[in-house]
């Protein structure tokens, strides 16, 4: 999990490094309470339970967030500072989010409703239409469907 700064709007992001599924939610602030809300949102709507959850060392992933991590993950890890390789999957997605959807603009809090619509459309595209080389040119949803049918 990570965050992307868009001025007065912050995108909390999460990626499953196996299926390439993502979760994104926009907030007006960058607090551990927001981090906790994003944790619950992501796991209740997308990820269910994982073996390992990794975040950067930001304050949004401390306090209330850390006290709830083990409801959703067996293990928790904080990436080492200045070691971007440890966050390469989420950093790659964050770059795609900027390049393909929200850009490099600085937004105001009152922009959130229109940004949420844009983000919702992008996530539908990302999960259902956008192929990934690491998934053998399948979308995340196609890959997940193939996984289930192979079991």
Provide a role label for each language-model segment.
Residues 63, 99-151:
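C-terminal domain-tail junction helix/linker
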Residues 1-15, 36-37, 48:
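Mobile-element integrase/transposase regions
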């Amino acid at each position: 999990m990570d965050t992307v700064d868009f001025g007065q709007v912050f995108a909390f992001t999460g990626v499953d490094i196996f299926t390439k599924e993502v979760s994104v939610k926009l907030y007006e602030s960058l607090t551990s309470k927001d981090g906790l809300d994003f944790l619950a949102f992501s796991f209740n709507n997308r990820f269910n339970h994982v073996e390992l959850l990794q975040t950067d060392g930001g304050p949004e992933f401390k306090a209330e967030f850390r006290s709830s991590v083990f409801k959703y993950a067996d293990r928790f890890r904080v990436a080492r500072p200045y070691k971007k390789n440890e966050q390469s999957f989420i950093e790659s997605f964050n770059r795609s989010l900027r390049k393909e959807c929200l850009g490099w603009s600085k937004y105001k809090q009152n922009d959130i409703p229109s940004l949420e619509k844009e983000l919702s459309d992008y996530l539908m595209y990302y999960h259902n239409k956008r192929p990934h080389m690491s998934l053998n040119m399948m979308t995340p949803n196609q890959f997940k469907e193939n996984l289930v049918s192979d079991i």
